[in-house]
Design a protein with these regions (language model features):
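A short beta-strand-turn-helix
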Residues: 27-47
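Loop/turn elements at helix/coil->beta-strand transitions in domains of secreted/extracellular proteins
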Residues: 45-47, 77-80, 104-106, 133
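Thiol-/selenol-based redox modules, centered on thioredoxin-like
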Residues: 132-133, 137-188
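Bacterial Sec-dependent N-terminal signal peptides
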Residues: 1-23
Length: 188
């Protein structure tokens, strides 16, 4: 009897954890044309890279080249990239100017109520979340170790955390490092 109750509790916790992660696709955001955008195509990809950005954050400005290189590197692979602006402080024009000024080749979506950032626990920009096809978080944190403190950058990047996580997913291997600490500007 006790064994049965324990198994029932474990099953409930697993179910609740699984459902909470699967709420990610149901969050409604706005694209830059004012249309509702849902991250509901997760199942079409092995993984989705969600990048939290801020047009006003110097590190987000600096990382646009790296983000573009990643998008190019994984073009044609079952990896989707989505940029999230989690703030109501930026107008569509502000976001479009950021995208144009830094030649950012990324689909940007507005999260004015910070629903997705709260759901995922994002607090910094730039911060990435690699989400699996079923909505499970495979990796979260920094893109790489270029920035190691606010205003301080390495001349040589020695850890490519996001690339390592994506490569593991594409190779059907477990992601070794599941979480790192992102460095950047706070999401407000």
């Amino acid at each position: 009897m006790i064994k049965r109750q324990i198994l029932l509790w474990i099953g409930c916790f697993l179910f609740l954890g699984f459902t909470a992660q699967n709420d990610i696709p149901n969050i409604r955001l706005m694209d830059l044309k004012g249309k509702i955008f849902r991250i509901n195509q997760l199942h079409k990809y092995k993984a989705t890279v969600i990048v939290f950005l801020s047009p006003a954050c110097p590190l987000c400005q600096s990382y646009t080249l790296t983000i573009n290189q990643l998008i190019k590197k994984y073009n044609g692979k079952p990896i989707q990239f989505i940029g999230i602006i989690a703030s109501k402080d930026f107008s569509v024009d502000d976001i479009l100017n950021y995208k144009r000024s830094y030649k950012l080749n990324l689909n940007l979506v507005r999260d004015t109520e910070c629903l997705l950032s709260k759901k995922l626990g994002a607090s910094i920009t730039p911060e990435v979340f690699l989400v699996g096809a079923m909505g499970e978080i495979k990796y979260s944190g920094r893109i790489d170790n270029w920035a190691y403190e606010l205003g301080k950058k390495r001349t040589i990047i020695t850890e490519h955390d996001l690339i390592d996580a994506i490569e593991a997913i594409l190779s059907d291997k477990p992601v070794k490092t599941k979480k790192t600490k992102a460095v950047g500007c706070f999401i407000e």
